Amino acid sequence: MVVIRLARGGAKKRPFYNMVVTDSRNRRDGRFVERIGFYNPVASGNAEALRVSVDRLAYWQSNGAQLSPTVARLVKQHAAQQAA
């Protein structure tokens, strides 16, 4: 099954997450098909905290990819952010 989930990067105590499309059997930070965005939970000031390629997200969802609960929450947050 293809899933869209977060892969952790960054340094110790400074997490940075890539939003990736991958096979559910792959490891969290392992091989992925495509990177469609990122989430930086420690962004400060004018730094961009969340970016999602909405067209690629829609493409993968139309091909049957499932969102992880965290990614679903972030996508909803991104949509509200774009509307405001």
Curated annotation (Swiss-Prot):
Belongs to the bacterial ribosomal protein bS16 family. GO terms for cellular component: cytoplasm; small ribosomal subunit. Gene3D superfamilies: 3.30.1320.10. GO terms for molecular function: structural constituent of ribosome. One of its GO terms (biological process) is translation. Keywords: Ribonucleoprotein, Ribosomal protein. The keyword Ribonucleoprotein applies. Disulfide bonds: none annotated. SUPFAM superfamilies: Ribosomal protein S16. Pfam families: Ribosomal_S16. The keyword DNA-binding does not apply. This is Small ribosomal subunit protein bS16.
